């Protein structure tokens, strides 16, 4: 189950996004925030897989929010949904690595395609992490076997040290 944070200062917009998420027939744990500052607090307190945010909100806009969390929460996927079609916002969003910038009113088909893409990315990242974990486990066991059998630690394959560095 993926955790989603919906951020918009307008309740009707949050409700609309929640409705579209439920129509996807996927399991999501959905939380909401009323502005960027509220969202930032929630993000620091919990792990979210997907951030769906508006741009123009009081206290902290969606671009600032993403800018504040993008380096800290590298695995979280960000999608903007906004009535703001100014090129500068879209350009900044792209630089921050958002998955998509959906204009309001949100087209259900576009929303579905975007969320499917996000879920596919999350699944691929999870599979990659699991593969790395299994590779590390194998290499640890191999290194232990070599040490127990009196082999020199320096003879352990370079791939072991390479994987260890990327843990």
For the regions a protein language model found, what residue spans apply to each?
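Active-site beta3 strand of CheY-like receiver
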Residues: 4, 46-52
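Active-site residues of response regulator receiver
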Residues: 8, 54
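Two-component/phosphorelay signaling modules centered on CheY-like receiver
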Residues: 11-31, 45
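Helix N-cap/capping motif at the beta->alpha junctions
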Residues: 32-41, 62-65
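Receiver (REC) domain active-site loop signature in two-component systems and cognate sites
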Residues: 57
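Interdomain helical linkers/hinges and coiled-coil/dimerization scaffolds
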Residues: 94, 103-164
């Amino acid at each position: 189950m993926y955790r989603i944070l919906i951020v918009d200062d307008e309740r009707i917009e949050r409700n609309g996004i929640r409705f579209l998420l439920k129509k996807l027939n996927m399991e999501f744990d959905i939380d909401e925030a009323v502005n960027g500052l509220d969202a930032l607090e929630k993000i620091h307190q919990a792990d979210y897989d997907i951030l769906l945010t508006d741009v123009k909100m009081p206290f902290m806009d969606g671009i600032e929010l993403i800018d504040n969390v993008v380096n800290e929460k590298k695995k979280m996927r960000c999608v903007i949904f906004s009535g703001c079609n100014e090129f500068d916002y879209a350009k900044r969003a792209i630089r921050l690595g958002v998955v998509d910038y959906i204009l309001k009113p949100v087209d259900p088909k576009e929303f579905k395609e975007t969320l499917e893409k996000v879920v596919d990315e999350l699944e691929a990242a999870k599979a990659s992490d699991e593969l790395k974990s299994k590779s590390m486990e194998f290499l640890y066991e191999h290194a232990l076997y070599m040490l127990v059998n009196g082999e020199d630690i320096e003879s352990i394959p370079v791939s072991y040290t390479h994987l260890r560095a990327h843990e």
